[in-house]
């Protein structure tokens, strides 16, 4: 299992998206983030697509997307950005 750390900027973006939308979309965001967190903790290198830079990846779970960095040596995943689409 990996430790999943959401950087403050990503958490702020998640909170902003959550409060600025309607209840049905909030439910979608909550379920998407729950799925993403589960995959980040269990298999982050198999989630989403790689990006330039060591351990950098991007993943989508409608209606959300995240950018994250996997540090295999320490077993830590850092979510660096969050947005909705």
Regions picked out by a protein language model, each given a short descriptive name:
Residues 1-65, 71-85:
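Basic, Lys/Arg-enriched alpha-helical interface segments
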């Amino acid at each position: 299992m990996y430790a999943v750390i959401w950087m403050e900027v990503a958490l702020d973006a998640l909170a902003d998206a959550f409060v600025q939308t309607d209840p049905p979309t909030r439910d979608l965001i909550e379920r998407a983030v729950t799925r993403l967190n589960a995959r980040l903790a269990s298999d982050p290198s198999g989630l989403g697509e790689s990006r330039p830079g060591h351990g950098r990846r991007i993943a989508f779970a409608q209606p959300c997307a995240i950018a994250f960095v996997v540090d295999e040596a320490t077993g830590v995943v850092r979510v660096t950005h969050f947005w909705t689409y």
